[in-house]
Amino acid sequence: MTPKRMNREHFPHWPAGLPHTLTTPQTTLVANLDISAIRYPEKTALIFFGQQITYRGLKAEVDLLAGYLQQCGVRRGDRVLLQMQNSPQFVIAFYAILRADAIVVPVNPMLLTDELRHTVEDSGAEIALSSQELLPQISPLLGETDLRRIVVACYSDYLSEMDADAPSWVCAPRQPLHDDRLTAWSDAIAQGLSPTTALAGQDDLACMPYTSGTTGRPKGCMHTHSAVMYNAMSGAMWAGAGSPDHIVLLSLPLFHVTGMQISMNTAIYAGATLIIMPRWDRDLAGRLITKHKVTSWTSIPTMMIDFLSNPNLAEYDITSLKRVSGGGAAMPAAIAQKLLDMTGLRYMEGYGLSETIATSHSNPVQRLKQQCLGIPIFGVDSRVIDPETHRELPANEIGEIIIHGPQVMVGYWRDEQKTREAFIELDGKKFFRSGDLGYRDDEGFFFFTDRLKRMINASGYKVWPAEVEAMMYKHSEIQECCIIATQDDYRGETVKAVVVKKPGSNISGESLMEWARTQMAAYKVPRVVSFVDELPKSATGKVMWRQLQEAERAL
């Protein structure tokens, strides 16, 4: 049989000593916690302000909660909703759902009732684990959907008495529950129940994150234990992040695949220590890095921009950091250089989607390129195609990025049509269509151009907002920038820059446009500039360009 073709231009830049593919254990994700609890029982697994939980303690609480879920009727293959801020309870709940042989449905805590309704109804979840401040959003769905019980967490249950850093909403005391369909987390644990023998295997579904709904209603991405395990292992091995000596700062939300995989699941696979931030706060991040000697931090560019622009930054000792990585958008060159000047560290960029349960591409540590997605990681074959003809494109031509690999989802939950549309066959392989435009260079490194549907058409010229944003960040007085389209009577569409100035800046829109004319082709130059105090961001810290674009079109 002729072997299936795979692009190999990037192999000369592969991380030294690592294989091109991984063989995952034939176990579920829960086995990672079990093994770390055996190997490092008294090692600290989680730190939440002043509270520490060992691997032995973490496994014990996971088993207790799993036993309670099974008593509530949770069975193999059931979907269980998980909606909380970053907290020890999120980690415990995630693994408890898996230990009960069920499927985790992680949900953005910012969603309101009508938004939650779709996820609950579509997934068919009957049980949810949430937190008391989110009850007003989720509890109305009891009785209106299949949802019949909510286990309610109180973050302050996991605080010690020495938690001066904890924000007031985390310190809020436990509130009484006046509905017999609600169970306090502490009561569920106190029942002392043990789970039955595990039945789920590596091919069972483990996690079903919902897409952000940028092209219609959110869709559940079905991922098996094997796929989630593969990427947890990949994260641990790729850049030497798999040492049990690592201290990992968790700043990304756990409901999102990057925080879930690259921070939580990779740390537990490795037996590392996870420092939990409930929400992003640049001063808290500085204090936690200083206090706990954090070695590994995965963030996104907006967090890093905010962190490095902090006037109090000099008060913190961040020299313990050994690895800083992230994705979600290209890191502006000026910010990457500032990080390098301050720490000697190069920001390691990567790429992935909900459909790939986080990483599919990453920069090799010894060959980092800036504003670059990196190379396909272990076992991944990635190509660039013409989105209309599906013809594979050569190096340096822009097209749609497609991905084949062990971490690619099985498909969308209960949506065969969208699943068919999401995949394409090439050389006998099934590739996922990312919807992202980009190209690969002569060395096999991939670069992001923009979302397929975000392009601005200015008098027939194609303008990619992400490219213009990267150039705008070179200006010393721009803190943040988002490029959108605005209507133009002559050009049809033209380029608009929505800008957040750095503190103390007096730059005008006209001077900014004059500067831009010296930096880029005339058709890319913003013809309209508006200044705002802040850009709208999602719970994961990404700039919500669609919100700005829709508001512009409504004018």
Task: Set out the residue ranges of the language-model regions.
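Conserved AMP-binding/adenylate-forming
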Residues: 47-55, 61, 66-114, 121, ...
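Conserved AMP-binding A3 loop
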Residues: 54-56, 206-230
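Structural core segment of the AMP-binding/adenylate-forming
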Residues: 71-72, 99-187, 503-505
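AMP-binding/adenylate-forming catalytic core of the ANL superfamily
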Residues: 111, 128-130, 297, 405, ...
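Conserved pre-ATP/AMP-binding loop-to-beta segment of ANL
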Residues: 175-210, 217, 241-247
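Conserved AMP-binding/adenylation subdomain of ANL enzymes
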Residues: 229-247, 255-296, 304, 310
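Gly/Ser/Thr-rich phosphate-binding loop
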Residues: 291-299, 308-369, 381
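Conserved ATP/PPi-binding loop(s) of AMP-dependent carboxylate-activating enzymes
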Residues: 375-379, 391-423, 463
